[in-house]
A protein has these predicted regions:
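A positively charged, amphipathic N-terminal helix/segment that binds anionic biomolecules
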Residues: 18-28, 95
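Intrinsically disordered, low-complexity N-terminal regions enriched in serine/proline/glycine
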Residues: 11, 22-23, 33, 72
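A short, structured beta-strand/loop element
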Residues: 30-52
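Negatively charged, low-complexity tracts enriched in Asp/Glu with abundant Ser/Thr
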Residues: 1-22
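Mixed-charge, Lys/Arg-enriched low-complexity segments
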Residues: 44-99
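Long, contiguous N-terminal structural blocks used for assembly/anchoring
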Residues: 4-7, 26, 96-99
């Protein structure tokens, strides 16, 4: 499984510590399946939270759209599964899904 950084978002918590969420495209080149991974790190603490869903779709276009939505809405690892589910549901309702 290959992992490629697609973007980052920074924010400060209630104790004024900088948090950085990194968004990765995961690719299984053998089976042409794409997924997503998120990692949240904090200054002076390193990696503090992560999650991944390695098998989401077989479409690079769909996974790129999903990752861009995750970045836009500053999704953190703890809400990754719920957020992906919401994105997929909305696309199906709009008739735009290729999944």
């Amino acid at each position: 499984m290959k992992k490629q950084l697609k973007g980052q978002q920074s924010f400060y918590d209630d104790k004024q510590r900088e948090n950085v969420v990194s968004y990765y495209l995961m690719e299984d080149p053998v089976h042409q399946i794409y997924g997503v991974a998120l990692e949240k790190s904090q200054e002076n603490a390193g990696l503090i939270e992560w999650d991944s869903i390695p098998k989401v779709t077989d479409s690079m276009e769909v996974i790129d759209h999903m990752i861009n939505s995750l970045i836009k809405y500053k999704v953190t690892p703890i809400s990754l599964a719920e957020s992906l589910d919401e994105i997929m549901t909305r696309e199906e309702e709009n008739g735009q899904s290729q999944i």
